[in-house]
Regions:
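Alpha-solenoid HEAT/Armadillo repeat architecture
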Residues: 118, 161-162, 205, 221
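Amphipathic alpha-helical interaction segments
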Residues: 93, 151, 155, 170-174, ...
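AMP-forming adenylation/ATP pyrophosphatase catalytic core
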Residues: 1-6, 25-28, 57-59, 72, ...
């Protein structure tokens, strides 16, 4: 919990739903007001009968700060923790992923798992806090234009609303839900294709490229490459491996000292230490 309206609303609704709730606060050490945030979250947890736990992580300033802070946060939080992402957060994520050139998974946005507020708007959580006379903390970093998400939130989405002459957030979220259904279907086919990469590459080569690409990404992660969300399997590397699967190359480098080869109708991944 950050002490903002979304996380406070999540706390209240989780308690009202009869769940045994523990409010977790993570201090990233990035701004001086973090102690006040922890106090507010602790007080809110006590008011609504929830337990409270505080965590501290170290996140050095520098590039990719948002992603590194998010990873550090999830590393200390328990598995299955609920988050206060709303419909607005989903729309922002879809647009951010679109600008990064993400594929189907990225355009499907965040998974619904552990996000019980995904059908609510940010205005709903603000209204709930006002009704309960809760005063959320305002994170000044959410207004900092150096962070791309903030520009999407404060500049791009209002511009799209104006151009479309309607609220685009529900439209973006509806499209992401449709794309998630497509992505899940492809994932099922990729699971079946995965075994062929190590046992019979020729069979994998006959499958549609969309399925083989997914199988390649899963295969890489299963073998220790690209597990870190900050460094997922690179799209160009996947295309090079696809060429190996199709016998257009006998091997390829995929970065960071890793290499993929095809031998005896099997795909092999070689780590920098092998």
């Amino acid at each position: 919990m950050s002490g903002g309206p979304d996380s406070l609303a999540l706390l209240v609704l989780a308690v009202e739903a009869g769940l045994q709730v523990t409010a977790h606060h993570v201090d990233h050490g990035l701004r001086p007001g973090s102690a006040a945030e922890a106090e507010l979250v602790h007080a809110a947890a006590e008011r609504f009968g929830a337990a409270f736990r505080s965590h501290s992580v170290v996140v050095e300033p520098g590039p990719n700060l948002e992603a590194r802070a998010r990873k550090a946060r999830y590393d200390v939080l328990p598995a299955g923790v609920l988050t206060g992402h709303t419909m607005d957060d989903q729309a922002e994520t879809v647009l951010l992923n679109l600008m990064r050139g993400a594929g189907l998974d990225g355009l499907a946005g965040m998974t619904p798992y552990r996000r019980p507020l995904r059908a609510l708007r940010r205005s709903d959580t603000v209204a709930l806090c006002a009704e309960l006379e809760l005063t959320p903390l305002h994170d000044s970093s959410n207004d900092d234009p150096r962070f791309r998400r903030n520009r999407v939130r404060h500049e791009l989405i209002p511009l799209l609303d104006d151009i479309a002459d309607r609220d685009v957030v529900p439209i973006l979220v509806r499209q992401s839900n449709l794309l998630r259904d497509d992505a899940e279907l492809l994932e099922e086919h990729a699971d079946r294709a995965l075994a062929n990469l190590e046992t019979n590459v020729a069979l994998a080569a006959e499958l549609p490229p969309a399925i083989v690409r997914r199988a390649i990404r899963k295969w890489l992660r299963n073998h220790g490459y690209g597990r870190d969300e900050l460094h997922p399997p690179d799209a160009k590397a996947v295309e090079r491996i696809l060429a190996v699967v199709r016998s257009e190359a006998v091997g390829c480098d995929i970065g960071q000292g890793w290499r993929v080869t095809r031998r005896n109708n099997r795909l092999r991944l070689h780590s920098p230490d092998s």
